[in-house]
């Protein structure tokens, strides 16, 4: 279904109306233990609980996550979302402000903010483009200044919290475009 022109509330309603799936390498995951901030920061949109509307894609993730001896498991989830941020449309001003607020205080993050200023200040830039620019800037700073990437985690965590505080409880984008697989809807909590 097309997301073009939908409000964050309309998008949430549409996504709430169908099941989503999460593929993992563990069979003992329970909803109460899911903490999006204890996940991999190197994922496309950083830390979060990634789901897809494609059971086939979730199965692939489950198999890859279980390679180290785990149990490939697919969990179905149903949402009760209120407002969803579409990462493929121009980032709303409150999202830009939430991200910018997280890039202050610590000199390497201030430097990263300067590096991405052209992108984040461009009103046509999508959340996806801004996030990619941040990841690239942090990667460059990490190498040039010999700062381990995990040193930036608190700031990425703060970005996610600030986006939540701006009123969004999930992010969505079209999966498969980067990997050449079939298009599918991804929702990140």
Annotate each predicted stretch with a short phrase.
Residues 1-55, 59-189:
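Active-site and NAD+-binding cores of ADP-ribose-processing enzymes
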């Amino acid at each position: 279904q097309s997301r073009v022109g939908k409000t964050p509330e309309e998008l949430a309603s549409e996504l709430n109306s169908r099941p989503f799936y999460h593929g993992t390498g563990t069979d003992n995951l329970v909803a109460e233990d899911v903490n999006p901030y204890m996940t991999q920061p190197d994922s496309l949109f950083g830390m979060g609980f990634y789901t897809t509307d494609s059971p086939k894609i979730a199965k692939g993730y489950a198999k890859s996550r279980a390679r180290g001896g785990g149990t490939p498991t697919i969990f179905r989830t149903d949402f009760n979302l209120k407002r969803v941020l579409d990462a493929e449309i121009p980032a709303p001003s409150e999202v830009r402000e939430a991200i910018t607020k997280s890039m202050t205080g610590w000199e390497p993050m201030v430097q990263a903010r300067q590096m991405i200023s052209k992108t984040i200040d461009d009103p046509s830039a999508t959340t996806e483009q801004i996030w990619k620019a941040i990841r690239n800037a942090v990667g460059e700073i990490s190498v040039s200044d010999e700062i381990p990437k995990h040193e930036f985690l608190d700031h990425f965590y703060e970005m996610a919290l600030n986006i939540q505080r701006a009123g969004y409880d999930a992010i969505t984008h079209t999966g498969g475009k980067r990997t050449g697989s079939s298009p599918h809807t991804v929702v990140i909590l």
